[in-house]
């Protein structure tokens, strides 16, 4: 699978952008376990152009993470364009636009999944951002606003026509938030639409190696994106890669092996602290989650 010139190989598995989760230390950890591409936490376009320090620091990426995508969100076209140009200066491999975040403080203000109620503005922003930068632009969104407005099949064509390089679809509506089950049937419909030629990345409820393989085989997606299933279990990428390659599950992980992961995470966090002090607390949260999972 390729996103423009970026070759992610066969059956790539990507780390989803997650607020308060995908900080530099966690991204590097997932990369070491086989994530083919990682995404930063989403970045507010409004805060970015106001030079809010905590927001600007989210643009810190390293070569060890590549390929890496920076994701932005917002509801104003000019602001999104200006933010996109700032992001491009950070030299990510990809710029991703968030049209899928369902939380009230984002969608309730018209950004993220809130854009699913304003498709003309969504397309205007997408077109403007694509035209404003030279790096590939991708989009992440949902099936639609609610069960009566699952518009993703038509919307995917419209977004493709705006010039995006790939599309990630979370298999829920905004109304579902993170409840119920992700509907991969519509993701498969988008992928099998003969008009679509850009890569389609599926996301939602991929929590086991077996489910990952099913998503590739049954729905034909070009890549699978792992979100909440990776939190406290960054080795899920290794498990899924092994299963895709061999058809077999990895042996159960030993406590000693998990402790070594924890030790390395502490080392990485301390090293990154010298550069990105603001991320230490978040890295500690990841460590705590790892311990709780055991």
Predicted regions and their residues:
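Glycine-rich, positively charged N-terminal anion/phosphate-binding segment
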Residues: 1-4, 9, 18-93
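Residue-level signal for pocket-adjacent positions within structured domains
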Residues: 3, 13-16, 38, 43-44, ...
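Short glycine-rich, flexible loops that bind phosphorylated cofactors or substrates
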Residues: 47, 104, 233
